[in-house]
Regions:
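Surface-exposed, interaction-prone regions used to assemble/regulate multi-protein complexes
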Residues: 2-151
Length: 151
């Protein structure tokens, strides 16, 4: 796989729900891999057709925590994925989750972002991301897709 950065055409934001649905709906996850730690972590979800959806943590690139968002795996997803949803909650300084906001609508503050998938077994958490920004360094995690190679 070539090096993918958040800023090239192969990458897309967590809030691009239609792109995520295009990859996941109708597929099942056969394996979940994790490499790196904290702000360079990449979660890789291997699908039944060989496609891999990668969720990348974000490092804001400064000495502080602005623009830094983690990615943590959720449940072991079982079954065929029927739908995908994103929940973003603006968090309070008291570490209590605040109100649900439109994904991608916040760029200043702190948030918990969850990517859910739905199967015949119900709602399952695929990715949880937490972080903050001051409006300058970037918001949320990002994704990339490695298409299956067919001969």
């Amino acid at each position: 796989m070539s090096e993918v950065s958040r800023w090239n055409d192969a990458a897309f934001e967590y809030s691009e729900i239609d792109r995520i649905r295009d990859v996941l709906v109708g597929r099942s996850i056969t394996n979940t891999l994790s490499r790196g730690s904290d702000l360079d972590r990449v979660l890789s979800f291997v699908l039944d057709d060989g496609t891999v959806l990668n969720a990348h943590a974000a490092d804001g690139g400064c000495a502080c925590s602005n623009g830094c968002f983690t990615v943590e795996p959720g449940n072991t997803v079982r079954g065929t994925i029927l739908n995908v949803e994103i929940e973003e909650r603006a968090t309070e300084w008291s570490d209590e989750e605040g109100k649900v906001v439109e994904p991608g609508s916040v760029s200043d503050g702190s948030a918990t972002i969850r990517l859910f998938v739905y199967t015949d077994l119900g709602q399952q958490t695929l990715v949880t991301s937490e972080g903050s920004d001051n409006g300058y360094y970037g918001w949320g995690f990002w994704l990339s897709v490695d298409k299956a190679v067919t001969a």
